[in-house]
Amino acid sequence: MGDVSVAVSASEVGKGSAENNATFIDKKNEVKKVILNGDKGIYQCNFQNDKCIDNPIKIGESMFEDAFISPDTGLAAGQVFIGESVDAYIYKLNAEAENDTKITAAWKSIPYQKYIPKMGNYDIKKSYGNGKIKSYHGYLFHGKYITLREGGNILAGMNAVTLGIPYDEFQKASGALHAGGILGLIRHKTTGYTYGTHPRYGEIDYQYLRSKYGYDFKIKNGARNSTYKK
């Protein structure tokens, strides 16, 4: 589907049933509403008083139905860049990880800093915008829309495979960082302490499911193979 627009007939959606679909954007491509019901479609329409007032147009699908809901606030957020892809950008960063040590990869994975060489390069919610935070800006990846926050988690999973890190080890570190910050990560690395149980180890689904997708995708294609099959 991706960037192909599909008109949704009134019998399929219409003004009344439009509220029962998933992700809605306005004519500026800004996310206005997300309803979690298993429909990953992204629909565009005119909004008035937080309601869709005409027949929506399906412009694509999200990879995950809650892509445009901030896990921090529970609110819909973001903007969809229709037809724009980050496949090549994510693949390029993953290829870069082939020359990283684990320490270098960790340096590139912490929050991006524009004027510090390579710091946070893999934090694509900021690095993609050269320092401007774009956590919930949505772009195509594998033909589905993801946010840059999701993209960073997918990349992290891919990089873990490239670096030869078992998924459980990777996830324990991610959970420690999420739950305890840098000090939590240090505690985990020095004592083995974990901040939750298998398989999330203290992380949230917005990280876990996306990183698992990236990890499994990279396993399928080979740790150091840059010719990808979806």
Specify the residue positions occupied by each region the protein language model found.
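Membrane-active amphipathic alpha-helices enriched in small hydrophobic residues
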Residues: M1-A7, A156, Q207, Y213
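Short hydrophobic alpha-helical membrane-entry/anchor segments
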Residues: G2-E19, D216-A223
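Glycine-rich short-loop/terminal segments
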Residues: V13-M158, T162-G175
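Active-site or metal-binding loop neighborhoods of secreted/extracellular toxin and effector enzymes
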Residues: D66-I82, V86, A173-K230
